Amino acid sequence: MRVSVRLCLPWVVNFFAKIFMPCIPSLHTARSTSTFTQNFFAPLLDLLIHANHQRVCPELTDQDWLCLGVRRAIEGRPSGRAFLQHLALSGVEGPEHSHFFETLKSARRLALVSEVSTALAAGLPPLPGDWWKCVPELAAFDVYAGDGHFHAAAAHDPRDAQDGCKDAVGHFFSLDLRSHALGHLTAADQVTRRKEHDMHALKRLGVRSLRQGAATGRKVFYVWDRAGIDFRQWHDWKHGGGLYFLSREKENMKLEVIGENRWDRADPRNAGVLGDELVATSQGVSVRRVRYYCAQRGEEFSFLTNECTLPPGVIAHLYRLRWEIEKTFDELKNKLGETKAWASSANAKTMQAHFLCMAHNLMIRCESELEREHGVRNEAELARRAKRLEKEHKRLAKEKAVMPFLVQAFQRLTVRSVKFIRWLRVQLFARPHHEPDIAALRHLFATL
């Protein structure tokens, strides 16, 4: 007989979870697994102990479900059936096909996954060697890059009655530019809109969700592409919620200069700044416009923001960093192979997005620990980057130009390499009962 025990009070759940969870046979964290595998998933299980939405379900425990979802995200199998078949061929006793997909529909499991995913992202430490010490003005800000990301529909999603096509599945994400933690903001509306606009989704979220748990008095700064522009909404968010936005000027915008802002031309961070202006918009509010010349690309850019205190060169560089969320989407799609929805239900699609975030964030933790504890770095890629920088310095010198100060100060690898992901898959899933082959990864990072 199948039994599922539901305990509603969080403190009761925590009490029984601490007693029973270590005794429930876990397919992913059993005693026979390596210390490396246990450490990789340990952050999820530590957060699970204190989660409000956990339940004692012996048939498929919450800890197994979390580990199973992350494994599904990292392994890159083309379908759920292929993933479950691979589990069976690997000697792992996974859930039945129907049970796996029914669990993806569960509202309670979605609430749990969302809770753990959000906590994991919030607890990710800043990446080492970043440039924030060069900009003390940002100490009072949480800084995110935000954007929408779409992938193919699920195999059993319905087709449109008019054109016979399936609508793409969209999600809106944020990337913490300090820690590179990926967070899920919301799934795109697939009921009333075929492709929800970014600003419509942001308005639907509201101030509380966009602040992502920031303390009262702390400012939250989003860098978004042109789809995130709504000047009236920017004004309301700034004065009602401490939210600030940065984007690029659209070609068809008619903005009137109504003032000039003072800025320090001697500050090396402002190299390339052409102007710092206050402009009037057609929506009856004014915004700040920073005009900037990028010596590396030989182009002029205009940035718009409702933040008026940061140096203009910092504003320009923050928009440069927006590209990192695009690189993260490329990591999900082309390196992890996540190109379509796992299932048709709205809960399943949202749960998939959270599992992708958890996989990304756990890989960052793993990569940082390997460097800190074993001195393993992607030396080959670092050497290639150094050569590119040297070549760029020489090119700019011939043109009697210099590389911007903040670009020189801020150099870091922004995505996980394919060779790291391949190595990780072997350690976690092909050799889960053996300690990791650190020497093999060091060799990969040094030569390929």
Predicted regions and their residues:
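Short, charged amphipathic recognition helices of the HTH superfamily
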Residues: I74-L89
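Active-site-proximal, Lys/Arg-enriched surface segment
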Residues: F101-L177
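An internal, acidic/charged active-site-proximal segment
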Residues: V116, A187-E299
